[in-house]
């Protein structure tokens, strides 16, 4: 049975290291564990999960899923690309799907360079600082858009 809603959950550089990298900041769950938790929490949604260390691969994935059609939106943790990738910003701006920017940590309580996001202005919203729940809130935000 085909789900009525399909979402892409996309993660950028270094998020493949979750569970190992700075667990006091990012938590102890791996990215696979986070993805499984999202799928379990929202069984009515068909998810595609994607992670890359490479900016171009993230951009290509956005364009690919838009070209395929059938996706209702994207939950995006761009990692460090959040702070400097004009190319990713332009790609988000170029697609018609809504994108929610999410972060595990509260970036505004961290180093100054993390306070600026170049992608926020082209996303429908930003969720940060709630750990794994940031992803769940991002999914809920996209699902709620159908009620507006």
UniProtKB/Swiss-Prot annotation:
Family assignment from sequence similarity: Belongs to the type-II 3-dehydroquinase family.
InterPro entries: DHquinase_II, DHquinase_II_CS, DHquinase_II_sf
PANTHER family, per the entry: CATABOLIC 3-DEHYDROQUINASE
Catalytic activity as recorded in UniProt: 3-dehydroquinate = 3-dehydroshikimate + H2O
UniProt keywords, alphabetically: Amino-acid biosynthesis, Aromatic amino acid biosynthesis, Lyase
Function: Catalyzes a trans-dehydration via an enolate intermediate.
Gene: aroQ
Active-site annotation: 26 (proton acceptor), 103 (proton donor)
PROSITE patterns: DEHYDROQUINASE_II
Organism per entry: Chlorobaculum tepidum (strain ATCC 49652 / DSM 12025 / NBRC 103806 / TLS)
Site keyed Transition state stabilizer: positions: 21
SUPFAM superfamilies in the record: Type II 3-dehydroquinate dehydratase (SSF52304)
GO MF annotations, alphabetized: 3-dehydroquinate dehydratase activity
Binding residue positions for substrate: 77, 83, 90, 104-105, 114
GO biological process, any: quinate catabolic process
EC numbers on record: 4.2.1.10
Protein name per Swiss-Prot or TrEMBL: 3-dehydroquinate dehydratase
Keyword Lyase: yes
């Amino acid at each position: 049975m085909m789900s009525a809603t399909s979402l892409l959950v996309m993660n950028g550089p270094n998020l493949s290291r979750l569970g190992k990298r700075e667990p006091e900041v990012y938590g102890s769950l791996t990215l696979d564990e986070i993805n499984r938790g999202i799928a379990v929490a929202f069984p009515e949604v068909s998810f595609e999960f994607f992670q890359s260390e490479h900016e171009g691969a993230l951009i290509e994935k956005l364009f690919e899923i838009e070209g395929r059609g059938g996706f209702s939106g994207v939950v995006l943790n761009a990692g460090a690309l959040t702070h400097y990738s004009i190319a990713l910003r332009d790609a988000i701006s170029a697609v018609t799907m809504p994108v929610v920017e999410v972060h595990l940590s509260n970036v505004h309580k961290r180093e100054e360079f993390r306070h600026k996001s170049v992608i926020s202005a082209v996303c429908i919203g930003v969720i940060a600082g709630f750990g794994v729940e940031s992803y769940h809130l991002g999914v809920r935000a996209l699902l709620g858009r159908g009620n507006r």
